[in-house]
Amino acid sequence: PMTVGQLVKAVYRAKELGLLVDLCCDSAEEAKMLATLKPNCLICEPTSLIGTGKTASETYMQEVVNAIHAISDDIIICIGAGTKNGNDVYNAIKNGAQCAGGSSGIFAAENPHAVILDMLDGFKRAIADFPRWQR
């Protein structure tokens, strides 16, 4: 873990070097604070749900999206934790994210290839239904 001061220095240094900056947050409060650093992407996932197969609630998704947009519309929002299929990806985008994280949902699956294809299908359906995700 980093202190806030260390995190700020690391973000500024990464930007100086031309690196993309992705930060993770647990709550809407953290999302809002981290959004002030203007990362390229904020990966939002309740820590308690990581690896559980349980997805974040629609309320959580909407709260983090609104918190980030209150600071900047230029930050890519990724909703993670519990994403295991195309419907989970669809719901993340429906609730304002541009993408969804699903590492344990893929790696723990019996057929990871099929899960990836299902997630891509959910993404395609979501961008057809919610074209506003493209900023």
Place the predicted regions along the sequence by residue.
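Glycine-rich phosphate-binding active-site loops on the catalytic face of alpha/beta enzymes
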Residues: 1-5, 41-54, 95-116
